[in-house]
Each structure stands twice: as C-alpha cells, then as structure tokens.
Amino acid sequence: MQIYVNGEETRVPEGINMAGLIEMLELTGHRIAVEVNQELVPRSGFAEQHLKEADQVEIIHAVGGG
C-alpha cells in the first residue's frame, strides 16, 4: 500500500503498524517523534498504530546539542 513519509510516497506492506515502519526505515532505537495525519503517536502506541492507505506520516529526529 502507499503512504507518505515526510512528504515522500512510500510503499509498505498492507496492515503494517508504526513499529514495523520504524523498523523498515531502520530507525529502531533512534530518538524520534512520530505524527500520523497530524496526530502525535506516543512511542508506547507504535505497536497499536496500524497504518492505512494514503496516511501522512511525519518523523522528526531529535538532535542533541548544547
């Protein structure tokens, strides 16, 4: 199925959840924030957040500094 990740069309397996997408994008263990269709998804909800055709996903990487 087709979704959008940070504005780019991305093909993913039907029924994938957010945890699967994070793994597919090799972001497991990274400090990120995720939004689906303009709704923030807490890290604790990644496994329950199933993606649907044409969902808009935004992934933001936390950058440390000082």
Label each residue range with its predicted role.
Residues Q2-Y4, E9-E53, E58-H61:
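Compact, glycine-rich, soluble single-domain proteins
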Residues V63-G66:
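Short, charged beta-turn/beta-strand-edge "cap" motif at the junction between a beta-strand
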